[in-house]
């Protein structure tokens, strides 16, 4: 799916759940949500982990 993440690390929209709201943390630039973990860098989703939070 497509994630649009702003420079503050907030996921603005997700085409996976169409809710546009996922729990996030700007610490370590991690966006953690229901569908796994995204590693964000300068507003870009570089990596997604489909099976939930895990050690990076």
From Swiss-Prot:
Catalytically driven reaction(s): a hydroperoxide + [thioredoxin]-dithiol = an alcohol + [thioredoxin]-disulfide + H2O
Q: Where are the transmembrane segments?
A: none
- Keywords assigned: Antioxidant, Chloroplast, Disulfide bond, Oxidoreductase, Peroxidase, Plastid, Redox-active center
User: Out of the domains of life, which is the source?
Assistant: Eukaryota
Subcellular localization, as worded in the UniProt entry: Plastid, Chloroplast
Q: What is its main location?
A: plastid
Keyword Chloroplast included in the entry's annotation: yes
Family as reported in the entry's similarity comment: Belongs to the peroxiredoxin family. AhpC/Prx1 subfamily.
Please report the name of this protein according to its UniProt entry.
Putative 2-Cys peroxiredoxin BAS1
The species is: Pinus strobus
């Amino acid at each position: 799916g497509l994630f649009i993440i702003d420079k503050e690390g907030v996921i603005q929209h997700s085409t996976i759940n169409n809710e546009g709201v996922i729990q996030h943390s700007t610490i370590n630039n991690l966006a953690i949500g229901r569908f796994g973990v995204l590693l964000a860098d300068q507003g870009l989703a570089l990596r997604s982990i489909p099976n939930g939070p895990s050690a990076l």
